[in-house]
């Protein structure tokens, strides 16, 4: 996916540059989505739709008079990391907006209840993306979202994979944001940017979205039963775990600026997300197994070695790639555990 970035110079003219980001735009089987039978949990979906329509955060994303001034007070050593966070987050939110909006449009006639839920979530994602993009604009930089929408590239995922992935993504987002907010409440001296003041309410949007996908999965038990689906659940749980941990364990990271220990923060978020997912999934990862933590740390170390070999020949990288693949396989082979006593998502 190519993102057009706009950067204003000291005069009134703008220069444009482009940066290549990893594709994060998805499409799916809309006909299969339209045929979902949610009648067994219709009351739960209607209750959640009522929450969506209440739009509790309608007035939340309003910048106060001191927002820009505080944004410009950021320590120069953290500015690049903050911009990276804003760009990555904005891209992710905009991706969600496009997917949810398209699903809502396609389901409007065949499955109006689901369509209305997706419409409300697309509203939230658009609001988040716009807020993040405006924060980038404080540094004379921002994503050209209209151009991005035209140039987007799609990766096809089956509906059940969309459900697994978005459920975990929204729940991880919730636990990430609330953990950061609570930490900065205790240590306000580490609040390097005013954006973090908004995380307490913001994370509730993420939580409601996660609850919605949890309801979909609970309403379609065939997506959670059987050995093949159980393997897919393990795959997605481990993929999200690895992606987060490997990214957060990089030496120069935003969490240092916030006064957080990146490894401890990542594990706490993963532990909470893992337990939360047990309300929906038939199994969870055994994060308390000492071997799991050892293998996870080993993967993070090997990933850093691999990045250090960037630009080297494939032959030079092969031993590290093989070691990383082997360690990931060992993680996958660790026996999962049963979730805590089952609860309804809502």
From Swiss-Prot:
InterPro entries: AcsF (IPR008434), Ferritin-like_SF (IPR009078), Rr_diiron-bd_dom (IPR003251). Catalyzes the formation of the isocyclic ring in chlorophyll biosynthesis. Mediates the cyclase reaction, which results in the formation of divinylprotochlorophyllide (Pchlide) characteristic of all chlorophylls from magnesium-protoporphyrin IX 13-monomethyl ester (MgPMME). Its EC number is 1.14.13.81. Belongs to the AcsF family. The gene is acsF. SUPFAM superfamilies: Ferritin-like. Its cofactor is Fe cation. Keywords: Chlorophyll biosynthesis, Iron, Metal-binding, NADP, Oxidoreductase, Photosynthesis. This is Magnesium-protoporphyrin IX monomethyl ester [oxidative] cyclase. Disulfide bonds: none annotated. Pathway: Porphyrin-containing compound metabolism; chlorophyll biosynthesis (light-independent).
């Amino acid at each position: 996916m190519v993102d057009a970035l706009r950067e204003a110079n000291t005069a009134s003219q703008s220069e444009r540059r482009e940066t290549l980001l990893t594709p994060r735009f998805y499409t799916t089987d809309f006909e299969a989505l339209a045929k979902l039978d949610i009648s067994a949990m219709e009351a739960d979906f209607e209750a959640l739709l009522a929450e969506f329509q209440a739009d509790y955060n309608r007035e939340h994303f309003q910048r106060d008079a001191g927002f820009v001034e505080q944004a410009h007070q950021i320590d120069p050593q953290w500015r690049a990391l903050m911009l990276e966070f804003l760009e990555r987050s904005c891209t992710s939110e905009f991706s969600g907006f496009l997917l949810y909006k398209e699903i809502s449009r396609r389901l409007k006639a065949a499955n109006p209840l689901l369509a209305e839920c997706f419409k409300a979530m697309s509203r939230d994602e658009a609001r988040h993306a716009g807020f993040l993009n405006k924060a980038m604009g404080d540094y004379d930089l921002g994503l050209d979202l209209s151009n991005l929408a035209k140039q987007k590239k799609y990766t096809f995922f089956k509906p059940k994979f969309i459900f697994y992935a978005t459920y975990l993504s929204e729940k991880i987002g919730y636990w990430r944001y609330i953990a950061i907010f609570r930490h900065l409440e205790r240590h306000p001296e580490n609040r390097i940017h005013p954006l973090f003041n908004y995380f307490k309410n913001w994370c509730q949007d993420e939580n409601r979205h996660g609850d919605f996908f949890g309801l979909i999965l609970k309403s379609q038990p065939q997506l959670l039963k059987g050995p093949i689906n159980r393997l897919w659940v393990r795959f997605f749980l481990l993929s999200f775990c690895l992606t987060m941990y490997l990214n957060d364990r990089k030496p120069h990271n935003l969490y240092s600026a916030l006064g957080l220990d990146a490894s401890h923060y990542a594990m706490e978020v993963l532990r909470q997300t893992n337990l939360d997912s047990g309300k929906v999934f038939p199994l969870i990862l055994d994060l308390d197994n000492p071997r799991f933590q050892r293998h996870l740390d080993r993967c993070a170390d090997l990933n850093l070695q691999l990045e250090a070999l960037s630009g080297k020949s494939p032959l030079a990288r092969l031993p590290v790639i093989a070691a990383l693949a082997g360690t990931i396989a060992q993680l996958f082979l660790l026996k999962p555990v049963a979730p805590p006593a089952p609860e309804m998502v809502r």
